[in-house]
């Protein structure tokens, strides 16, 4: 089973992924937790290039670098894990590329879909949890954690985070467009709800999606 988590930066994906991983471990469910970009030696090196603020990368270059890390991760880690019936939890997948590079950066969506299909070997998540939060709220949340001023665009954050409110509004709207076209695999969550409440909703959704995870009823 492939589970993906999506949302703009500051939505709380990492918190929910950690909670889910803990429950799966306690229930004795074999699982693997990964992140994009990253997950392999090559992908982690590319991640540092993508996220370091001193590097300026074109929209197309950014897309191709993300796609390179994804191809490595899917072929080397995700597919082998799924073949052993492990649950794979992924912090971002190709929906992030659609939202960020497509709707955010303005890259042609038709070209984007071709590259996505090629780099993922047409792998589709079984369920995608989208944690929704307004960019303004996400920025306040992230800056409060980093003890930085609220002038988000001017803060010394990584290159992508410095894109600002307008960019993140485009990304959020892009996610809504994606969800409308593939409602069957998305579970939309209000990221401002208490983390424990969100966790319960995630477990309930997984139990319905995969009866084999009935062991999660105890948690």
UniProtKB/Swiss-Prot annotation:
Matches recorded under HAMAP family: Thymidylate_kinase
Annotated protein name in UniProt: Thymidylate kinase
Catalysed reaction, written as an equation: dTMP + ATP = dTDP + ADP
Function recorded in the entry: Phosphorylation of dTMP to form dTDP in both de novo and salvage pathways of dTTP synthesis.
Keyword Nucleotide-binding included in the entry's annotation: yes
Organism: Chlorobium phaeobacteroides (strain DSM 266 / SMG 266 / 2430)
Gene Ontology CC annotations of this record: cytosol
Domain of life per record: Bacteria
Enzyme Commission identifier(s): 2.7.4.9
Gene behind this protein: tmk
Any Gene Ontology biological process: dTDP biosynthetic process
Keywords assigned by UniProt, alphabetized: ATP-binding, Kinase, Nucleotide biosynthesis, Nucleotide-binding, Transferase
NCBIfam families reported in the protein's UniProt record: DTMP_kinase
Enzyme class: transferase
Residues annotated to bind ATP: 7-14
Single GO term (MF): ATP binding
Stored SUPFAM superfamilies: P-loop containing nucleoside triphosphate hydrolases (SSF52540)
Family, as annotated: Belongs to the thymidylate kinase family.
């Amino acid at each position: 089973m492939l589970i993906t988590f999506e949302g703009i930066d500051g939505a709380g994906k990492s918190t929910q992924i950690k909670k889910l991983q803990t429950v799966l471990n306690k229930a004795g469910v074999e699982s693997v937790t990964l992140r994009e970009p990253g997950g392999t030696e090559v992908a982690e090196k590319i991640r540092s290039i993508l996220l370091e603020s001193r590097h300026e990368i074109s929209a197309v270059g950014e897309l191709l670098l993300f796609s390179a890390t994804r191809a490595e991760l899917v072929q080397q880690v995700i597919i082998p894990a799924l073949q052993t019936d492990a649950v794979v939890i992924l912090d971002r997948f190709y929906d992030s590329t659609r939202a960020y590079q497509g709707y955010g950066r303005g890259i042609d969506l038709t070209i984007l879909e071709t590259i996505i299909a090629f780099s993922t070997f047409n792998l589709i998540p079984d369920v995608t949890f989208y944690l929704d939060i307004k960019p303004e709220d996400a920025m306040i949340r992230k800056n409060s954690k980093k003890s930085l001023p609220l002038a988000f665009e001017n803060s010394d954050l990584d290159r992508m985070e410095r894109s600002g409110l307008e960019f993140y509004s485009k990304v959020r709207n892009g996610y809504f467009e994606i969800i409308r076209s593939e409602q069957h695999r998305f579970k939309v969550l209000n990221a401002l709800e208490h983390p424990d409440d969100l966790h319960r909703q995630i477990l309930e959704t997984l139990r319905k999606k995969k009866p084999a995870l009935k062991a999660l009823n105890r948690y």
